[in-house]
Amino acid sequence: MAVAKSPFYIIRNFLSPKQCDVIIDKLRFYEPDVDTEGNPLKMIRHEDESETLIFSRFEPLIPQLEEYYDYSHLGTEKISFEYYPQGCETEPLCENSNWVNKKWVRTKNRDISCILFLSQYNENPDFETDFEIYGGLLGFHNFNFSFHPERGTLIVFPSGPHFINSTSPIKMGDLFQARFHLQGKLPYLYQPDKFPGADNPLRNWFQGLHD
């Protein structure tokens, strides 16, 4: 029997709660944009100081990711800092491809994607509105599971169509997260047989996490 290996590389405590709070303060999202019907919209910003902090922590990890994914790193995109206000709903997305003529077509030079949670999930009545969120789960449709936002945790995964993802509706609070992408020297092809355990990912893939 093959030893299970997760295609999700998870690093808890990548940033401290205090560092997450500082980034949220720097983003200066005050009032959400709305659509024509008054529904709040996801907003994106770039913030140079916060990007420098994240990349200073991330760059030493690149050799580990190269080995883990059997991938040769070429470069990293700018970080998009995302704000999902209460009531916001979004559509599923693929990080590097679009659905064209009934098939996925790669349209972006992205091979590995990263999402860093800056907010903390909480479904209990004792709720800290400054940094906690109810809703905002990061769902991966092909694997039928979701990650609860845990501030300071970094989720790394391949960018292709096997990893279509979405953020569930924000029921209470505001969700903040950072999203960025890595490009390889050659296009990365996700091969499921190199990541055994998809028959029961919650049991097989997440027994041990990276701190």
Annotate each PLM feature:
Residues 1-154, 162-211:
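Fe(II)/2-oxoglutarate oxygenase catalytic core
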